[in-house]
Structure formats: C-alpha cells, structure tokens
Amino acid sequence: MFARKFIIIASVLFIALSAPIYARKAALSESEIADLTFMREEEKLAHDVYVELYEYYKGGGTELIIFANIATSEQRHMDAMLGLLETYGIDDPAYPLPGVFANKTLQELYGNLVSDSEDNVPILNEPTSGGKVGVEEAMYIGAWIEERDMLDIMHAISNTNRADIAGVYTNLLCGSRSHLRAFVKQLGPDDYDPQILYSSDDVGSEVQPEETLEYWLGDESDEVCM
C-alpha cells in the first residue's frame, strides 16, 4: 500500500515538474521548432567549417586567424541556440563530434565546404570550389556561410512572434553581419559581390534585390554583437 502510494505521489510530482516544459514547447508552432533545431545545427556548421579551415591553413598567414576568431563567436551562437532549445524543452539535434550533423543537407554541405575539389555539385548554391582549394576560396566559403546564415535568420525572425526567440535571432544576425564584414575586408570590398543575398533563388519578402552590399554589411560602429 505504501509503495503504491509512493509511486502515485512520485508520478504526480514528475508530471507537475515536467508540465511547464511541455507547455512551453506546445506554445511554439512546428515551424518555430523546426527553425530552432535547424539554426542550432547551422551555427554548428559554421563553427566546424571555420575550425577545420583554420587547422588546415594554420601557419599560412596572419589573416587566417579570422577563422579561429569567428569560430569562437560561432560557439557563442551555438550556446545561445542551445539555451533556447533547453528553455522550450526541445531535443538538441547537434552531435558533439565536429563535422557530424543530424540534418542530411547540412552534412552534405559540410563536405563540400571543406573539400579540396574545384568541381563540387552545389547543395545550397554554395561555391563549387571547396575551402581547401586555396586561401581565397576559403574566404569566399566563409563569406557565403555568413550570407546563408543571414538569409535563414531573417526568415526565422519573420516566422516567430516570441520576443525571446526573436531577440536571440537578432543577435545572431548582428554577428553574421559582423563576420561577413570581416571576410569581405580580407577579399577586398571593391572586388566582392554578394554570392546569394541578391540571388533570385534566395530572395524573400524581407530581402530586396536592389539593396546594396553596404546595406548588408551595415556600420560596425553602430553594432555590438555576441
């Protein structure tokens, strides 16, 4: 009798303690949940690519420290997304091993981005030359990643009405813009053309094709990003 009563009490306590998490998750739409899980892995993709390219080119020039510096920032972005997943009781899709992804598209994309081939078949309109073809190609890979992140983050912002989620996304967007500025500076602002921000395949209602590169890069003196 005592054992049965104990089990009942324990079950009630478990349900009571768990209810807030399930309630928070239930408050999100399926698309919001999908955005959160995708964004967590997309930030991991950026982090893992930059770490891999830094290790590959390490010692090749001082400009390559950009990959290590931005990888550190991407880790903060990953942590911020993990915080949102935990807040809403959503399972974390990110594997701890570098270069391993639950999302099959991101897995294939990672392979292209860090390859030494000049003839990759694009997965998401990325450059056909992988980041290990040369330093310039690696910089273009970095810039492409940040452009891709910006598009996906803007889509995710338009897809939620929750202030906490939108706030994290806005910080991520600020960070991606800062990272894009850094890569464009290495490539030469006068020589760089956006790779997908103006692409008709990627432009949505929140992205206007006539907007300039300067618009996307923003003014770094006005921004403090995580």
Enumerate the language-model features and the residues they cover.
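Bacterial N-terminal signal peptides that target proteins for export
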Residues: 1-7
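Short hydrophobic transmembrane-like helices used for membrane targeting/insertion
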Residues: 7-8, 21
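Bacterial N-terminal signal peptides
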Residues: 9-16
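Sec/Tat signal peptide C-region and signal peptidase I cleavage site
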Residues: 17-23
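All-alpha RGS (Regulator of G-protein Signaling) helical domain and cognate RGS-like helical scaffolds
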Residues: 25-226
